[in-house]
């Protein structure tokens, strides 16, 4: 898919245990506003693999890009976002490692949120989240039936991803926005606030679960549109 619009293209990068459909409620709202948008489908097998898959999509786009990352996707846009076409980064309850830092390093800085206790290891190097975790911790503000579907759809995450180091963090040299989920039970809320402050991001706090993009899509879209508008008026 190639975009030739002069309007910035929004590229959506999903998190762990998810795919591009996690943006299903945000995408129609962006399209309604005439914003070109592409949702990446990442393998969640390593930071390098996910960054490469994201770059392939970026290479298909002409003109400025707004990269949006949810959760683990924040590490991906941090790694892939140094491309000159990337003009803005939007982090949604997301990790944002510094140079030489891993997601595991960031997780370890604060007491573990309750959702992390619901991670299951298959013994072969891959992790999933229990159905209970999806219902009570990941998407506790979603209908139970919706959370159960997400549990069924989740792809396994390579456990080694938590040890993958960022090389050059894009947030150091790009305009940034950060959405904090104040009811997050998967990523530490204190960590989210710390990361937003460290990058000097324009910060929005939502009284939402880790899945604000599904429970509060209008509010998430509003922040993305703010980033798009900032580039259009720059």
Pin down the residues of each PLM region.
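Conserved loop-alpha-helix segment in the C-terminal half of the alpha/beta-hydrolase fold
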Residues: 182-208, 214, 219, 226-227
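Conserved acidic catalytic loop of the alpha/beta-hydrolase fold
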Residues: 48-65
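Gly/Ala-rich beta-loop-alpha elbow adjacent to hydrolase catalytic centers
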Residues: 68-73, 77
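Flexible "cap/lid" loop of the alpha/beta hydrolase fold
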Residues: 82-131, 158-165
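Conserved strand-to-loop "acid loop" that flanks and positions the catalytic carboxylate
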Residues: 89, 177-184
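Conserved HGGG/HGGXW glycine-rich cap/lid loop of the alpha/beta-hydrolase fold
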Residues: 5-48, 79
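Catalytic His-Asp charge-relay segment
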Residues: 173-180, 203
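Active-site nucleophile elbow and catalytic-triad environment of alpha/beta-hydrolase enzymes
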Residues: 149-170
């Amino acid at each position: 898919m190639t975009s030739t619009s002069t309007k910035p293209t929004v590229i959506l990068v999903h998190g762990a245990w998810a795919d591009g459909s996690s943006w299903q409620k945000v995408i129609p709202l962006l399209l309604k506003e005439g914003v070109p948008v592409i949702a990446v489908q990442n393998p969640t097998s390593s930071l390098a693999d996910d960054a490469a898959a994201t770059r392939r999509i970026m290479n298909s786009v002409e003109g400025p890009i707004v990269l949006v990352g949810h959760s683990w996707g924040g590490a991906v846009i941090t790694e892939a976002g140094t491309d000159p076409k990337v003009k803005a980064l939007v982090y949604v309850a997301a990790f944002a490692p510094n140079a030489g830092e891993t997601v595991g390093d960031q997780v370890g800085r604060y007491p573990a949120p309750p959702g992390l206790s619901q991670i299951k290891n298959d013994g072969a190097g891959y992790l999933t989240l229990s159905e209970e975790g999806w219902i009570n911790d990941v998407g506790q503000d979603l209908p139970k039936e919706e959370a159960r579907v997400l549990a069924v759809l989740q792809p396994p995450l390579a456990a080694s991803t938590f040890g993958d180091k960022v090389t050059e963090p894009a947030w150091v040299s790009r305009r940034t926005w950060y959405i904090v989920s104040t009811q997050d039970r998967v990523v530490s809320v204190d960590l989210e606030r710390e990361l937003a402050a460290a990058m000097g991001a324009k910060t929005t706090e939502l009284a939402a679960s880790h899945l604000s993009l599904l429970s509060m899509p209008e509010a998430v879209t509003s922040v993305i549109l703010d980033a798009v508008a900032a580039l259009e008026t720059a």
